[in-house]
Amino acid sequence: MLRAALSTARRGPRLSRLLSAAATSAVPAPNQQPEVFCNQIFINNEWHDAVSKKTFPTVNPSTGEVICQVAEGNKEDVDKAVKAAQAAFQLGSPWRRMDASDRGRLLYRLADLIERDRTYLAALETLDNGKPYVISYLVDLDMVLKCLRYYAGWADKYHGKTIPIDGDFFSYTRHEPVGVCGQIIPWNFPLLMQAWKLGPALATGNVVVMKVAEQTPLTALYVANLIKEAGFPPGVVNIVPGFGPTAGAAIASHEDVDKVAFTGSTEVGHLIQVAAGSSNLKRVTLELGGKSPNIIMSDADMDWAVEQAHFALFFNQGQCCCAGSRTFVQEDVYDEFVERSVARAKSRVVGNPFDSRTEQGPQVDETQFKKILGYIKSGQQEGAKLLCGGGAAADRGYFIQPTVFGDVKDGMTIAKEEIFGPVMQILKFKTIEEVVGRANNSKYGLAAAVFTKDLDKANYLSQALQAGTVWINCYDVFGAQSPFGGYKMSGSGRELGEYGLQAYTEVKTVTVKVPQKNS
């Protein structure tokens, strides 16, 4: 994702230096203790306590200390939000009667307000999530703005067609909004995933009930305030903080929710699809887990491949669904690649995410912290070679040392399961045919990458790999214009681009009898 925000020369100083230079020249100094303004439930453009009056703590992962209490929504709160959304979607409502171009203007206005408050939002994201502030400001917020503005431009351009059917008839299609859209967003990119969900839904005229992740609710709730300020009618966007088994399950199984979009684990994706099918057969789009292969051919530019493979795995503390978490290296360059990758990992700066020199902050919470350490222990027990890292990186907070394993075999747990942390696994291969089979031998199929100077190899691998996105000589290059989604158990449907609009519309055919048809 960083490549979308920081276009740099193909050769040049490594990522940390680029970020430091960008930080000193472009990024305002953060307030390391931003005030929390929004910690309730947002329904009908108003703030509410939970029906149960329950709250839960959101925690600063750098320290383990509580930031504040947040209203804990559950089924009753979801019911209230759905009713508000239904009212906003009624025929003749201000939202339904609004011109498509005006919907676009509201999205542009929302983007402008987010840009106005960019420094505050970046600091709040870092406080609640733990990602480096420079990344929050330069990458996440930049992509949020681009996504919302991209979909604002689509609002009056995604439409139906006239169809020349036989006989004295006039036939045309309409692209109509689906209705009440449940959206459940993850904790690894809270603001960005909110934009990915809201952009296409609002551009096409839907109404939204969104559940934010309990680990990172604060920035998405602040954006709710900006949604009201932008002028969206009451009930168009409703945001419920809460937990998956309660608030999330209520959305997935609700009889009056017409569609659910979820980004998160494959395990939870299963539950959502079952709940959707056993309720009202609501539409489902799922962006789930991954174990993405990153293939380094022997003819690759070694400097570039090492740095990009490091970035592919360690970016965002390794908390990326599309992380290059199986690094396949051709045998004649394996030793050199491993040596250089270990050196790069050892030089990675882990620390205070508000320090502009920091490359890696803490994991999002204690649960993830312990889970990752458990995977590291599993790798050692199953015979992988621990080359660096392997433990906690600080006395407090949820920091983990950048970790690299060599001599990893396909059957090992760390080579099969999504770790979602700063743990690199390097595997050796001989031939291109071999690596295709091994790369595809996974239940996941979200992304893949190939590093080679041979265009024929690149083209062959891009066609052979079972993944929704394949990067050639790059990694994590995203644009609002390009669709993203997975094969197999990495999900269904696509987000971003024109393809991302399809899941939020129903295509209606209208056929009219006419006295006489003329060409």
UniProtKB/Swiss-Prot annotation:
Note the SUPFAM superfamilies from the entry. Answer: ALDH-like (SSF53720)
Q: Which Pfam families match?
A: Aldedh
Question: What is the superkingdom listed in this entry's lineage?
Answer: Eukaryota
Under CDD domains, the record lists: ALDH_F1AB_F2_RALDH1
Instruction: Please give the family membership noted in the entry.
Output: Belongs to the aldehyde dehydrogenase family.
Q: Which Gene3D superfamilies match?
A: Aldehyde Dehydrogenase, Chain A, domain 1, Aldehyde Dehydrogenase, Chain A, domain 2
* Source organism phylogeny: Eukaryota, Metazoa, Chordata, Craniata, Vertebrata
The UniProt entry, under InterPro entries, shows: Ald_DH/histidinol_DH, Ald_DH_C, Ald_DH_CS_CYS, Ald_DH_CS_GLU, Ald_DH_N, Aldehyde_DH_dom
Report if keyword Cell inner membrane is assigned. Answer: no
User: Where would you say this protein principally sits, based on its record?
Assistant: mitochondrion
Motif SIFI-degron, per the record, lies over 12-26
EC number(s) from the headed UniProt entry: 1.2.1.3
**What is the name of the protein in this document?**
Aldehyde dehydrogenase, mitochondrial
The known PTMs are summarized as:
In response to mitochondrial stress, the precursor protein is ubiquitinated by the SIFI complex in the cytoplasm before mitochondrial import, leading to its degradation. Within the SIFI complex, UBR4 initiates ubiquitin chain that are further elongated or branched by KCMF1.
> What catalytic reaction does the record list?
an aldehyde + NAD(+) + H2O = a carboxylate + NADH + 2 H(+)
Primary role: Required for clearance of cellular formaldehyde, a cytotoxic and carcinogenic metabolite that induces DNA damage.
